[in-house]
Amino acid sequence: MEIFGTDKAFLPLTLDKACKDDYTALTIGYANLLAGHSDPKGRSIMYMEAGRQDKTKYSRDSMVRAIWYMLHAAMESEETQKYGILFITFPAGVTMSQVDRGLIKILLPSIQGTIPIRLSAFHSCQPPAFLKLVLPFVKLFMSERTKQRILFHMGPTEKVRDKLESYGLTRDNIPQSLGGNVVVDTKAWIDSRLAAGK
């Protein structure tokens, strides 16, 4: 209710109803569901590119709704319902001012225990040095189970890609920014779902 407000809380979670005002947050490229891609178990992949955040273009609630929408879209897959979802974050290039602690404070508690989806793994690839300062704050809002599923992959892109491959994430399921073959085009995916009334 807090995130969607009384005017949207009971509307269908579709792009033309509950998320009708969230197009910018959905398409800015911060949160991306890699539709059609999964790990060997069938877990959907959410790709977070922190350097694309721009708090001046959307509200925190709008971004939370956008991520909720993508997580619910991921749950359209039976494998994701069974085995969960994994996150790949690519915070390289993000500045300290782009880290939105307020968004984290709203987002993590709203997802954990609310959305019926398992968080299988959280792969943070090439994190900036200042992440050591931010991570303790982020962990305040994570369940113990989630904290145990955070993995850090440092080094050059090739090394990171090889590490992801050791977890079953092949080039065909890794974004190009991390040495994979996936072209991330969330705007096209959102536009196709909007046209389909989803």
Predicted feature residues:
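Basic, amphipathic alpha-helical/coil surface patches used to engage anionic, phosphate-bearing ligands
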Residues: 1-198
